[in-house]
């Protein structure tokens, strides 16, 4: 599907093979720190302080499992999740799957694209429309790297992930959170009221992203001369590092919002622009600037990942291909329509996260069916424990997202 890479392993130790294969999980991990996460984590931290940090911890653990299963499917079978669904499900079901997956990808891209545009607006004082134009140009330039193969794209997106992580280390230094209270928030589950449950569902819904479940299996489905066991060992290392970084960023987002807003009496911060403006007098212009830069980096990289995921679902489900630049133009249109119509940008981010909740179970259930199939997976088939944990994740995700949807209706 996407470009693989050949690596001569005859004279190389496993440690070096692991390092050469690192990358796909860094592309997937970007989806876990997109602008939707910014909005949700800021609101949760401002409203409840450190209380909901434990939700981020467990959501990230669940996301690690999901991404590892997705990557393993590609390694074991040489096919991605969309292709397996196409080959094993009735044709009408496949077409329905494709349509919902495309809607999910476009909803995701809408949030990510508008998030980056907001970042440009805040940082450079341009209009939201001008920010959208800058976002479009920047994403085209990043996507051009795909012509050089998968590795350059992995390096750039991985670099942006590390930049966002570094930015939030700076934000934590500026905000000076209470370390003891932060630790308690991470370790002690607590949902003080119905609004906390609502925000917890939002955090989980913004964390596990259906489009990268499809994408990750495509990023790992081709390889060089390494054995499947070697590739899977490398992938576990890749997923652990990338998702730990993404988890740290989400924790830092919420902790910064708690320290800067909640404990300074600003408990009703619900919009990204409001958070930026409020940061300036509280922590200084430097902190606000770092926040804006991290929002741009997260938005640009995640919208690129969304475009790649769109290619995977179209080619995988219906064997149809369109040039990347055409897809980028088509998926930008809803963002420009929203901006030109004067809709509330942050509200659109929240609505897009709700729409995503419809696609999570639709991706997770067949993924578990396939990775638990001995005939299909061979020696990489899931253990009984893995299958139980996977089904538990499905139940939690579906339950909390159902609560989120019912609460919003």
From Swiss-Prot:
Spell out the subcellular localization from the entry. Answer: Cell inner membrane
Residues in a coiled coil are none
Recorded family membership: Belongs to the NRAMP family.
Q: Where are the transmembrane segments?
A: 19-39, 46-66, 98-118, 122-142, 155-175, 196-216, 241-261, 290-310, 320-340, 348-368, 388-408
State the annotated membrane topology for this chain: Multi-pass membrane protein
What Gene Ontology molecular function terms does this protein carry?
Answer: cadmium ion transmembrane transporter activity; manganese ion transmembrane transporter activity; metal ion binding; symporter activity
Q: Which GO terms describe its biological process?
A: cellular response to iron ion; iron ion transmembrane transport; manganese ion transport
**Organism field:** Yersinia pestis
Q: Which NCBIfam families match?
A: nramp, Nramp_1, PRK00701.1
Highest taxon of the lineage: Bacteria
Q: Name one GO cellular component term.
A: plasma membrane
Give yes or no: UniProt keyword Hydrolase. no
Query: What protein is this chain from?
Result: Divalent metal cation transporter MntH
Summarizing the function annotation, the protein's role is: H(+)-stimulated, divalent metal cation uptake system.
Going by the UniProt record, its keywords in alphabetical order are: Cell inner membrane, Cell membrane, Ion transport, Membrane, Symport, Transmembrane, Transmembrane helix, Transport
> InterPro entries annotated for this entry?
NRAMP_fam
